[in-house]
Amino acid sequence: MAKESPQEKEFLQLVKQHERIIYKLVNVYAVDEEEKRDLIQEILYQAWKGYAGFEGRSAFSTWLYRLSLNTIFTFRRKESRNGTKTGAVAAEPWEDEQANSSLEAKMLLKAIRELPELDRALISLHLDGYAHAEIAEVVGLTETNVRVRVHRIKKHLITTLNG
């Protein structure tokens, strides 16, 4: 077994530290367990491939979030072109104790999964506690646009959940 290089050790440590980002996004966008596994594997592959180019101009978590979203969107476009499953809304809730503990959380997750891809990314980042400036950096929008869109998404979710 080959010894890990310092770069590999650093990468693995950073991924371990921020793995929740990957799992949360995959659970929001993926339909079934097989698709989740495929996406996680592809995200990790793309992250390792791109890690040498990570210059630290943003936080690793921001870089990983952006890379994960790009990988998910590319994966879904490929599935769409190939005529395989895509765009379906997953029925199962997040594999998170807090989400599983209440009906409201399950309903919220279902409503989030029904949002367009970019809106899902915006609200996921917002719910993860990212500031509007950080979200703007991740998704490539202006901070003002992010603020407005997040506000509209929240209003839409409230309307949806209140029937």
Question: What do the predicted segments below correspond to?
Answer:
Residues 1-24, 37:
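A short, charge-rich alpha-helical start-of-domain segment used by transcription regulators
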Residues 4, 42-59, 78-79:
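Sigma70-family region 2
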Residues 15-33, 50, 112:
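Amphipathic, Lys/Arg- and hydrophobic-enriched alpha-helical face
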Residues 24, 38-45, 58-70:
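Structural recognition of an alpha-helix C-terminal capping motif at a helix-to-coil junction
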Residues 43, 67, 122-123, 135-136, ...:
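Hydrophobic positions on the alpha-helical face of helix-turn-helix-like DNA-binding modules
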Residues 53-55, 66-86, 101, 152:
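Arg/Lys-rich amphipathic alpha helix in sigma70-family domain 2
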Residues 139-163:
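DNA-recognition helix of helix-turn-helix
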